[in-house]
């Protein structure tokens, strides 16, 4: 069910690496096959997951997506305490054409029931967090929108973190 995988390295962010995966449908991530794969990790997967530090795992729906393409740089703003009305307020700020070098802005809303940590399942403090992704041609372009550009509409939502990443690679479905 996976159709794309992207890997980033931090420019000015934590954690050091960021991986984004896309699926044909959101339901793939709640399917018996996916749950079985998570429950029966290979020895290689277990060894690699054990090395993860400062890991954030979020299974999220893309609820707003404006613009086209993938950028060489990514701005990321992580929000906690978001409410459904925030989605509409944020949408009014998601216009990549107004910002030089920004080619896309998306909102990803974490699903608390599917976003449990693989390394510490009892820690679900950020399972329902939302993420604003800003795709751009340069670090400077995406940094101009993180997070002050959105501060006037956040209300009670808290910015947990923000930062910038550089794209390392992008794999399409045929590559996976």
Question: Which residue ranges define each predicted feature?
Answer:
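Glycine-rich beta-strand-turn "strand-cap" elements at beta-sheet edges
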Residues: 6-15, 39-72, 100-127, 147-176
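Short, well-ordered beta-strand segments in beta-rich or mixed alpha/beta enzyme
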Residues: 9-35, 69-80, 87, 115-146
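Short aromatic-glycine motifs in intrinsically disordered, low-complexity regions
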Residues: 44, 92-97
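Ser/Thr-Pro-rich, acidic low-complexity intrinsically disordered regions of eukaryotic RNA-binding
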Residues: 84-92
